Amino acid sequence: MKELLINNTIGSFLIGILAFILLCIIMLPTILRWLGLHPHYESKDYNLEDNKALIITTSHDTLGEGGKATGVYSSEMTIPYYEFSDARIIVDLASIQGGKIPVEPRSLKWPLTTAADKRALKDTDFQNKLNNSIKIDEINIAEYDLIYMAGGWGAAYDLGQSQVLGQKISKAYAEDKIIGSVCHGALGFLQAVNENGDNLVKGKQMTAVTDKQINELGITETPLHPETELRKAGAKFESETAFKDIFANHVTRDGNIVTGQNQNSSGETANLMMKLLSDKK
């Protein structure tokens, strides 16, 4: 009898442990959101019909020479895409080389995937744009009211190095377009200049993924680190911090330029861009 009681107690204890582990697994996305990863952002209800937005991404798909697969961080593309399209904005996808946009595989895996990512996977129109993105050389930037640059590790290899992208961003700025970026997407500003030929970011309040977050994630082999490069170019870099910067969040605006710190900033960045556009009308 005593042995049976002990066995029942052990069994109940093990069941309790398993139930606790299962609950933690189920609740992990919610816990991460509570800590600051992909926080819920209450979108404004805009109707910006007859306006156009361009989302620009990387075309680079590997970390280093023959390293792990990478690309654009999915939510940094999908969240702004649906924020814009739900406001009745026509949205195009472009990339440095055109064609199929590489997506960071880890950004589509549990528990990092978002509702916008899941929506995009089922959206045939989005998937067609993703697989047939417009080459940046072929873009007529004058057609767009909003220009947004998504991040991801791949962006460290081609956004900041593209003179063509720099020319497009320079022209967009000169034409009073609203330009935004999140995370590594801010590297797309590096080749852009103002009307005097100075670095466009010089003296501007900007944010992007921090050196601290890059070091914490241990992916330091990428050629350009946004915080370092923006500071070198003369930007007034600002950011928030957390016990791990992957849980931090910050969005800043300087005139028509809106920048978000990391993947947590996508919704707020897109909404602030739309607010600026709405205020122009």
Predicted regions and their residues:
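Active-site cofactor/cluster-binding pocket
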Residues: 178
